[in-house]
Amino acid sequence: MRHYEIVILVHPDQSSQVPAMVERYQSMIKEKDGKVHRLEDWGRRQLAYSIDKVHKAHYLLMNIESDQGVISELENAFRYNDAVIRSLILKRDHAITKSSLIMQGAEKGKSSRKEKVAAEAEASEEA
């Protein structure tokens, strides 16, 4: 089995369907004895350029281990799903399980905001 990294851009109007789509794709992978090593939902983000007059998209990242047959099925599923506006499948040398730089940046931003709020709360209590 080979390792793959998959990035999926979903139309922003279809964001509510993302959990069902993820479940469907995971079941396709697991039916054929594949494994999902990492799944990240990056949420809605601004596109670098518009695609079909859409300026934002809902991003998903998956790292999987599977056969080529599963990849072909996933490509067909992406191609015929109107909610998917772009997809990219890359072959990787090994399984990637740690969080991506985008998620690390988001977590860092959340922690720094929490620290800032806590510091402001302490300052207001002292005053």
Curated annotation (Swiss-Prot):
SUPFAM superfamilies: Ribosomal protein S6. CDD domains: bS6. GO terms for molecular function: small ribosomal subunit rRNA binding; structural constituent of ribosome. Residues 107-119 have a biased composition (Basic and acidic residues). Residues 104-127 are annotated as: Disordered. One of its GO terms (biological process) is translation. InterPro entries: Ribosomal_bS6, Ribosomal_bS6_sf, Ribosomal_S6_plastid/chlpt, Transl_elong_EF1B/ribsomal_bS6. It comes from the Bacteria. Gene3D superfamilies: 3.30.70.60. Keywords: Ribonucleoprotein, Ribosomal protein, RNA-binding, rRNA-binding. One of its GO terms (cellular component) is cytosolic small ribosomal subunit. The keyword RNA-binding applies. HAMAP family: Ribosomal_bS6. Belongs to the bacterial ribosomal protein bS6 family. NCBIfam families: S6. Binds together with bS18 to 16S ribosomal RNA. This is Small ribosomal subunit protein bS6. It comes from Coxiella burnetii (strain RSA 493 / Nine Mile phase I).
